[in-house]
């Protein structure tokens, strides 16, 4: 019962869309109404408000970290509990019950989850994102590369462990890549927006 409650709680935590909440609190346009229509930090940045984008990034990462940390801290369900919390908070961000199941792509939330699973895993994945984003200026490309490398880092740090947490990392990476399928098409067509590019309603 504890595992079930923790999993539901993690999903509800993930369902809090900081892009929408922060934008509303600051009197800004709903990020689902412009740019990529994605309620995430990158699209909020396209709206031209760096403070809102930073708050969104921190909030989305924090909720991912919090959901997993709580399960680990209280020892709920061991590795199975951690894995379920990780997937649940991630799915909550992707399909939030509070926002008609229309959520973001999960990059910041996944980073928070990985930091809670193990700081080295989270930092290595975040650093990969930063390097690709810095040199290529594509948030989506950075996210895709980081998603590919997250399971690789997991194996490098912990070996070929056959446990629920490792499978949760793989599942999140696969879901993140799938959520970026439209971005992949735009990248291949040379139509993807770069980091910091202003919003358009088209």
Curated annotation (Swiss-Prot):
GO BP annotations, alphabetical order: phospholipid biosynthetic process
GO CC term, one of those recorded: plasma membrane
Reaction(s) this enzyme catalyzes, per UniProt: an acyl phosphate + sn-glycerol 3-phosphate = a 1-acyl-sn-glycero-3-phosphate + phosphate
Subunit structure and binding partners: Probably interacts with PlsX.
Pathway: Lipid metabolism; phospholipid metabolism
Family matches, as SMART domains: G3P_acyltransf (SM01207)
GO molecular function terms attached to this record: acyl-phosphate glycerol-3-phosphate acyltransferase activity
Name under which the protein is recorded: Glycerol-3-phosphate acyltransferase
Main localization of the protein described in the UniProt heading: membrane
Classification via HAMAP family: PlsY (MF_01043)
Topology in membrane: Multi-pass membrane protein
NCBIfam families registered for this protein in UniProt: glycerol-3-phosphate 1-O-acyltransferase PlsY
Annotated localization: Cell inner membrane
Record has Lipoprotein as a keyword: no
Origin species: Burkholderia thailandensis (strain ATCC 700388 / DSM 13276 / CCUG 48851 / CIP 106301 / E264)
